[in-house]
Amino acid sequence: MKTPRKEIARALRYMQDYKIKKESMIMEYKKFNNQYVIRIDKGEEICAKLKEVAQKENIKLAYLTGIGAAGKVTAGVFDTKEKVFKGHTWEGDLEIVSIGGNINTMNGETYTHFHISVADEAGNVYGGHLTEAVISGTGELVLTEIE
């Protein structure tokens, strides 16, 4: 019997190798027990696509981990004194060093809460609370549903 980790790695390889060339690729995902292995393609926005999966699969609570490449990322911090979100946008060739967070529901609405770290080609790392990340290459994510 294959372990879940091996199954996840196999699914990611399959999705990368089997990629059919189209003008517009769409996100793909596969479920293994309580985990969704997700590939997000160039031009797609991470938060929107993960919310789409959660709603389609009726996921009420889950946590996320992943890596990938983005061309535009907006993230920041909440200023607790001024009670305002201070966001920054980075554009260019950015490696997603790490993305993590959760999906939950409140009053029937799906909410995402993700944090991201990205690195530029000089090795500078930026990050914070994620509001937008547009994929430039591919995003490889694992969403684990909590029952």
Sequence positions of predicted segments:
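Enriched for short, Lys/Arg-rich terminal
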Residues: 1-24
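N-terminal intrinsically disordered, cationic/polar leader segments
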Residues: 26-113, 117-147
